[in-house]
Amino acid sequence: MKLNVNLPDHPYDVIIENGALANIGNWVSSLWKKQKIVLISDNHVNGLYGQKVVDQLEKSGFEVETFEFPEGEASKNLLTAEKAWNFCAEFGLTRSDGIIALGGGVTGDLAGFVASTYMRGIHFLQIPTSLTAQVDSSIGGKTGINSKMAKNMIGTFTQPDGVLIDPEVLKTLGQREFCEGLGEVIKCALIADKDLWNLLTDLSAKDLLENFAKIEEIIYRSCEVKRKVVVDDELDNGVRLYLNFGHTIGHAVENTAGYGKVMHGEAVAIGMVQISKIAEKKGLMPLGITDEIRKMVKKYGLPDDYQPWDEALLFKALTHDKKARGTIIKTVIVPEIGTAKINEVTFEEMKEYLKK
C-alpha cells in the first residue's frame, strides 16, 4: 500500500507493507544518493532492528553511524538533541547527508527536530516502529522536544523525504504499547472516518494482534486521515487542528503526570473522554456520545480518566498549549462520529472545564 503526501513544496510517499524493513537498502537508495547517514534510535529498538538496518544500508553503499539514546519520553529534550547534533558533527555529516529515525514517536520527533536544525536542516526519513508513530506522528512533518513547561514546546515543521511502515515490527510490542497506539486510531475514526469507527466496533485488540491484514488496513485508513488533513493544512492553522482532538487535556495529563508515566495514546484517550464529557454537558456534542467514546477506549485497553486530577496543575500546563492564541485556546469537538469542529474556549472557561 502506498499513500502520497502531495504537498506542493515537498511531496513524499508513505509505504505500508508487511516485511518492508527487509528491503530498506533499496528503499533508501531510491530516495538518496550514496552518502553518510546517522541512524537515530533508542536503546530498545536499536537492539531489535538497528544492526539489521545498518547492514542493509552499508550493503547498499551508505556510510552509517548510529546515535542511540535511552528509551522513553524523558529523553525527548534539549540535552539529547545537543548530544545528537554533536554526534552528527563528529561523524562529519554535511547538508548533503541525512538522518533516519528508527523507532516510535519519541524517536521520530527527536530525530526530525535534530535533522531540521542541524546546519539549518538536512534530509531525513521516518521508519516508525510503534503503532502510534505509524498511524500519526511519522506523517506530517511535526518535529519537537519537550520542555518542563509543556510537551513538544520546542519544534519545527519539517517534512521527511519518505516514510516506511512495516506492520510486522508491531509483533515485538507489549500489549500496553500496542493498545496505546489505538488511542490515535480511535481519534482518526472520530474526527474523519465513520467506517473506521464501525470497523473498530466490530473488532477487538485481540483480533488485531492475531490478524495483521486487519492491522495493515487500520494503519492505512488512519494514515489516509492524517494525509488528507496535512495536505489541506500543512502548518496547523485550520483543519489540521482536528488531529488534536483529545490532545489539549491529553498533553496536560502527560505533563503533570511526568513524561512517560502516562503514554501518549493513553493520554489522548483520557483527553477525548474528558473533553467530550464537558462538551456534551454544554450541548456542543450529542447526548450519549461520551459513553460511546468511553466504551470504545476501554474496549481497547485504554484509560478514560486520570488520578490524581489536579485542576491547578492541569490548567497551568494548558496555558502553554500550542493551540492557545492570547487568552483563547482552540479545542476540538466531535459533533457526530466522523466529523470534527473547532471550539474556541477562554482560559477562564477552561478552568471550569477542568472541574469535576
Swiss-Prot record:
Which spans are transmembrane here? none
> Which CDD domains does the UniProt record give?
DHQS
Q: What would be one Pfam family of this protein?
A: DHQ_synthase
One GO BP on record is: amino acid biosynthetic process
Q: What class of enzyme is it?
A: lyase
Q: How is the cofactor bound?
A: Binds 1 divalent metal cation per subunit. Can use either Co(2+) or Zn(2+).
**Keywords per UniProt:** Amino-acid biosynthesis, Aromatic amino acid biosynthesis, Cobalt, Cytoplasm, Lyase, Metal-binding, NAD, Nucleotide-binding, Zinc
> What protein name applies here?
3-dehydroquinate synthase
Q: Which organism is it from?
A: Lactococcus lactis subsp. cremoris (strain MG1363)
